[in-house]
């Protein structure tokens, strides 16, 4: 079904020459982002950077569906844009053995793209068409909030939801305190009310909790 609130736009190219698409939920008559940005917040979601980690793709499809059918009510100052599948070439390189510890599916894509690049390590160097396309998409959107969806690679995480959030020190005093003390706490409390228990994502590698775990840097 077609919805006038949903746009499906070709906005880049994978290393294999196939297009990268952006899905935009915009319930407003105005479609010019430069105009909308004046009084609207833009949320940008990246999906499928690692094939075999499909949860974010599925969740985004469900979210867009529920927004378009008005099952979910949103504030009247809000637009969502999402890359549907960032690493489409990796998704086409399918097997059943690259994620030995992960429970299903029976077949999935390979972590690297068509040139075997881990795109999660190419945001700054931009050796791939994918990364250069991402930069163009990001500058086109100029989002207020960015989310990059991942899934654990078969590790036994006990919590439903793990996250890496921006280090508050990197945001500056005012924005950093707002994000850490208000925005993030509100999000986590709202998720907990819905039965989703969350915890920061950490790499253990034999460490013990007594000395703490290092925080990830989001760059």
Question: Model-found features: residue ranges?
Answer:
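Structured catalytic-domain cores with a bias toward divalent-metal coordination
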Residues: 1-219
């Amino acid at each position: 079904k077609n919805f006038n609130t949903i746009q499906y736009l070709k906005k880049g190219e994978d290393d294999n020459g196939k297009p990268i698409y952006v899905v935009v939920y915009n319930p407003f008559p105005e479609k010019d982002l430069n105009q909308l940005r004046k009084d609207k917040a833009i949320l940008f979601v990246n999906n499928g950077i690692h094939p075999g980690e499909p949860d974010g793709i599925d969740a985004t499809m469900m979210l867009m569906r529920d927004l378009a059918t008005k099952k979910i009510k949103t504030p009247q100052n809000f637009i969502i844009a999402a890359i549907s599948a960032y690493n489409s070439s990796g998704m086409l390189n399918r097997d059943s053995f690259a994620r030995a510890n992960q429970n299903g599916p029976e077949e999935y894509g390979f972590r690297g793209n068509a040139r075997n690049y881990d795109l999660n390590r190419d945001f700054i160097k931009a050796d791939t068409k994918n990364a250069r396309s991402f930069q163009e998409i990001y500058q086109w959107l100029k989002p207020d909030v960015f989310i990059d969806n991942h899934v654990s690679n078969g590790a036994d995480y006990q919590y439903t939801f793990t996250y890496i959030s921006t280090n508050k020190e990197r945001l500056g005093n005012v924005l950093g305190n707002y994000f850490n003390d208000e925005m993030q706490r509100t999000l986590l409390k709202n998720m907990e009310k819905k039965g989703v228990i969350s915890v920061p994502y950490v790499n253990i590698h034999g460490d013990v909790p007594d000395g703490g775990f290092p925080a990830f840097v989001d760059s």
